[in-house]
Amino acid sequence: RQMCIRDRGKMPEKSVYSLTEKGKQQFEKLMLEISCKPINIFLDFNAVIVNLDSMSRERQQECLDNIESSMEVLKKYLEENIALKKSKEDIPVTGMAVLRQQYTLAEAIEEWIASLKKEINS
């Protein structure tokens, strides 16, 4: 890693780091390794879901409501973050793509929870 200092006028100096050639090779190696690995989606709340049958209906509903509420908070945060960064030119396309991916997953989980609640309550 190499560092250089850029003068920013009245702003404090900013350190800018760049990779050495060896660092770049290692970075690319790691990127390729990770991109070949199986994709795992582990959701902490699935431990709750698989054990809901061990709880009373009231507690099941409470757990699902809690998960649903947490998902709403996440979705709202992502909406705000996307709106904030959408107009910024320095945000890479790939960064925005990951935010939209997370939002899409949050929407899908929100729909899934709603359908699970209907199944449990029927």
Enumerate the language-model features and the residues they cover.
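Generic C-terminal helix-cap and adjacent flexible tail
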Residues: 118-122
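Heptad-repeat amphipathic alpha-helical coiled-coil interaction surface used
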Residues: 61, 68, 75, 82, ...
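Alpha-helical structural elements of signaling/regulatory helical domains
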Residues: 55-59, 87, 91, 108
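Amphipathic alpha-helical dimerization/coiled-coil segments
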Residues: 28-76
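Short, small-residue-biased leader/transition segments that mark boundaries at the very start
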Residues: 1-5
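Acidic interhelical loop/turn segments
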Residues: 79-98
